[in-house]
Amino acid sequence: MQYEIVSAGENVGDEPERERPVAQAAAAPGIPRPAALPAAGAARRGRDLPRERLLARGPAALSDAELVALLLGSGLPGHDVFALAHTLLTRFGSLRALLDAAPDDFKGLRGIGPARTAILVAVVELARRALAEKARERPLVDSPGAVDDYLRLLIGTRPREVFVCLFLDARHRLVQTEETAHGSLTRMAVYPREIVRRALALNAAALIVAHNHPSGAVRPSAADRHLTRVLRDALALVDVQLIDHFVVGANDTFSFAQAGWI
């Protein structure tokens, strides 16, 4: 990615309905016993089982498709909710891609209307907010794993490059996260002057910056290293510390600080 570095001059109820046991017919010569459950009851029991396992054993006991099915709630005529969940995972390629999808990505998908779209999008937003809340509770330099998780969830699977700034207070706790630049397929214009201005407006004492590589490869380019030096020097002029620059992929991150490049 080439950078343009622009200078100053430029269901009601929580309890599932339980199946009532089918009475066993008296054993009589030549008369078979009835099935333990009718077909419809078996299907409903199958739908309830993941919910019961989650409550009894925790969410880790469920597969990705089962967790998605719990979010969806019900299926379509002729297709149960598990088939719908599998269809979604196949359509998007992975759970991460499904949950990172924008609302428009669900348009035209059979069985996914506005209500289910809102649920799927809200789940990821809740996760982002929970991680941001965690980042505000203690210095980010003391919890690098939380920073990695937050950044991967925030920009790790974006289809285009995004440059984000994490503005920190004097104790290195998160004050605010802002997306300061968005790239095309080949370029992204980053304005150090504007980043400095926002740091001063937010009374930030330090910054962590990050951008994603949609390819998934997180090794920094020469342009990434040059941008980091320019931004570090611009912030130093106003006594704001650049703590780290992360390059983020869907499954990995690269830290300039850990590499000794800041």
UniProtKB/Swiss-Prot annotation:
Q: Where is this region: Disordered?
A: 1-45
Q: What is this protein called?
A: UPF0758 protein BTH_I0781
- Which residue spans adopt a coiled-coil conformation according to this UniProt entry? none
NCBIfam families (alphabetical):
PRK00024.1, radc
* Ranges of residues in domain MPN: 140-262
Q: Which keywords has UniProt assigned to this entry?
A: Hydrolase, Metal-binding, Metalloprotease, Protease, Zinc
The listed location of motif JAMM motif is 211-224
Q: Which domain of life is it from?
A: Bacteria
The answer to whether the entry has keyword Calcium is no
> Which Gene3D superfamilies does the UniProt record give?
5' to 3' exonuclease, C-terminal subdomain (1.10.150.20), Cytidine Deaminase, domain 2 (3.40.140.10)
Stretches of Low complexity bias are at: 22-43
Single GO biological process annotation from the record: proteolysis
Gene Ontology MF terms: metal ion binding; metallopeptidase activity
Residues noted as binding Zn(2+) in the record, renumbered to the chain: H211, H213, D224
Q: Could you say which protein family the record assigns here? A: Belongs to the UPF0758 family.
PANTHER family registered for this protein in UniProt? DNA REPAIR PROTEIN RADC, UPF0758 PROTEIN YEES-RELATED
Q: Which PROSITE patterns match?
A: MPN (PS50249), UPF0758 (PS01302)
